[in-house]
């Protein structure tokens, strides 16, 4: 409660009101980020499946080890997604329509984490070393596959897309850990979510902005 008490000048009633506001804001942010993540992973996955099909003849880059350099960029996180998908399948009720079925590519895809998608993109952090092999591999994947996932962005080196995804990933982690949003420019980051989705499909962006309640809750911050 420390950040809320500080913001409320040690007034416990105001601090609790701020805490409740932050929780409600976090829930609305999480909803928007969750939808955005689905759109982003589906768009990137479509291009990665096509790329892996060209490289290996097998479109699934999740169920089996993909071609290099995608293999090295995703190896640990890909295996973790498979493990979670297999665990989920093993927990299916006998009455589940897919009881006993093998996991599919889509099962594994649904169990990927947002951080994996950021890690595949060209790294534009200020202290990045472009000559490192993994960074060259990220650039290669962008040029050969992932740039096409964002057809409405003029982003030849992936700089804009990387920072949009990075900002969303940071906010996603903050919200999932129930960290304070008191000093976070939530509307700016949510704007990145809308722009990112718009770079995939303008219709999806219009739909997403129509569902937003983040701005309404953000504006209702207790004084």
Regions found by a protein language model. Give the residues of each.
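Amphipathic alpha-helical interface elements
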Residues: 1-171, 177-187, 191-223
């Amino acid at each position: 409660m420390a950040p809320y008490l500080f913001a409320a000048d040690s007034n416990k009633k105001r601090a609790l009101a701020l805490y409740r506001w932050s929780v409600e804001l976090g829930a609305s942010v999480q909803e928007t980020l969750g939808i955005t993540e689905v759109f982003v992973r589906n768009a990137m996955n479509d291009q990665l499946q096509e790329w892996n099909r060209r490289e290996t003849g097998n479109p699934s880059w999740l169920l089996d080890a993909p071609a290099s350099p995608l293999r090295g960029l995703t190896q640990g996180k890909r295996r973790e997604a498979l493990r979670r998908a297999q665990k989920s399948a093993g927990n299916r009720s006998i009455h589940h329509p897919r009881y006993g079925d093998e996991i599919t590519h889509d099962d594994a895809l649904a169990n990927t984490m947002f951080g994996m998608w950021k890690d595949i993109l060209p790294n534009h952090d200020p202290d990045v070393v472009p000559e490192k092999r993994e960074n060259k591999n990220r650039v290669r994947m962008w040029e050969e596959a992932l740039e096409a996932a964002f057809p409405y962005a003029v982003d030849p080196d992936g700089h804009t897309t990387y920072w949009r995804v990075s900002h969303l990933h940071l906010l996603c982690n903050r919200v999932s850990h129930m960290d304070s949003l008191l000093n976070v420019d939530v509307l700016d980051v949510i704007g990145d979510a809308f722009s990112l989705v718009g770079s995939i499909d303008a219709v999806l962006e219009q739909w997403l902005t129509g569902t937003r309640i983040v701005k309404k809750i953000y504006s209702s911050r207790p004084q």
